[in-house]
């Protein structure tokens, strides 16, 4: 692992904080009770635009319907630097002041190594928002594009390395959840990729347990269309930066998105119907039954995280 630009934040940690131990770089503003207040904090009702409301309320709907969060959760949010992950983190921060229980947030950023200083604007924003974080520079991107990667696609290898490291960080910091910023476009593209390439009828789970339930992978923005996320990111003035990966825009997912754009043109309402149908289907699939009894292996406990 390459040592990166985030090392200066290490000194922000109080001696008693568990985030200080171990390798890597982190700072703590609210990650534990020993370092300061954690979880939900009183906050005034800010005026939000329509796009911002869509993001915050849709995240709340996903949280409530699937029971993805509960009291005492410690949620690690994977922040890549794109609009999706920034809006996810901002929306969860707002929902801390809405839900009737306490949960904690920690941003996890793994710089892939193409531009080691690309995340320079992230740290001041996190400090301003009062969000704990772990930031590090890796070599995952260059490794995925090197001769070392003989068997897998570039995206598969890079994603596998990042996911493995994120799981390690969740274990180090005692996080119960890992939140990813996938949106409705990602759900639709994944559904058709699974159908056309693998012969499977499957999408992206909103709440999925790993390690015998020790960690839950969640996707609170899976009901939100990308256009609302982009608009909300601009309105919140989030410090989004460009993706420096040389393979960006040349992936199987981007090719599927282009194919789907042709499908959307078949009828006037094709896109709306496809999005509404698949998001409802995925939400129903990941929601526990009304009586609270759940026999499905992939669903989460029926806790409440909505309005």
Language-model-detected regions and their locations in the chain:
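ATP-dependent adenylation/nucleotidyltransferase module used to activate substrates
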Residues: 5-8, 14-20, 27-191, 197-200, ...
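Conserved active-site and cofactor/substrate-binding residues in soluble primary-metabolism enzymes
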Residues: 54, 161, 224, 251, ...
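Catalytic subdomain that performs nucleotidyl-dependent activation
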Residues: 105, 178, 185-265
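Residue-level detector of flexible, active-site-proximal loop/helix-junction positions
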Residues: 114, 140-142, 208, 224, ...
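Alpha-helix boundary/capping detector
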Residues: 118, 152, 192, 196, ...
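Short, basic, helix/turn surface patches
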Residues: 158-171, 204-213, 260-280
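The feature marks non-catalytic terminal segments
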Residues: 238-307
């Amino acid at each position: 692992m390459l040592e990166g630009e985030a090392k200066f934040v290490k000194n922000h940690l109080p001696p008693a904080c568990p985030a200080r131990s171990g390798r890597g770089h982190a700072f703590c503003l609210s990650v534990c009770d020993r370092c300061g207040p954690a979880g939900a904090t009183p906050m005034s009702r800010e005026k939000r635009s329509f796009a911002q409301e869509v993001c915050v309320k849709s995240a709340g709907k996903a949280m409530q319907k699937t029971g993805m969060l509960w009291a005492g959760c410690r949620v690690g949010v994977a922040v890549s630097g794109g609009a999706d992950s920034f809006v996810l983190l901002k929306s969860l921060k707002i929902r801390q002041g809405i839900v009737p229980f306490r949960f904690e947030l920690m941003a996890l950023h793994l710089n892939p190594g193409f531009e080691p200083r690309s995340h320079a604007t992230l740290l001041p924003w996190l400090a301003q928002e009062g969000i704990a974080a772990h930031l590090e520079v890796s070599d995952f991107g260059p490794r995925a594009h090197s001769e070392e990667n003989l068997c897998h696609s570039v995206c598969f290898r890079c994603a596998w390395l990042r996911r493995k490291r994120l799981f390690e960080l969740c274990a180090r910091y005692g996080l119960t959840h890992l939140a990813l910023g996938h949106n409705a476009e990602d759900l639709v593209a994944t559904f058709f990729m699974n159908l056309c390439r693998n012969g499977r009828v499957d999408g992206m789970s909103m709440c999925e347990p790993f390690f015998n339930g020790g960690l839950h992978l969640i996707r609170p923005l899976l009901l939100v269309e990308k256009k609302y996320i982009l608009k909300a990111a601009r309105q919140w003035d989030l410090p989004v930066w460009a993706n420096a990966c040389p393979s960006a825009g040349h992936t199987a997912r981007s090719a599927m998105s282009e194919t789907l754009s042709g499908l959307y043109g078949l009828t006037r309402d094709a896109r709306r119907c496809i999005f509404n149908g698949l998001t409802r289907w995925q939400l129903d699939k990941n929601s526990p039954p009304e009586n609270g009894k759940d026999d499905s292996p992939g669903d989460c406990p029926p806790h409440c995280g909505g309005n």
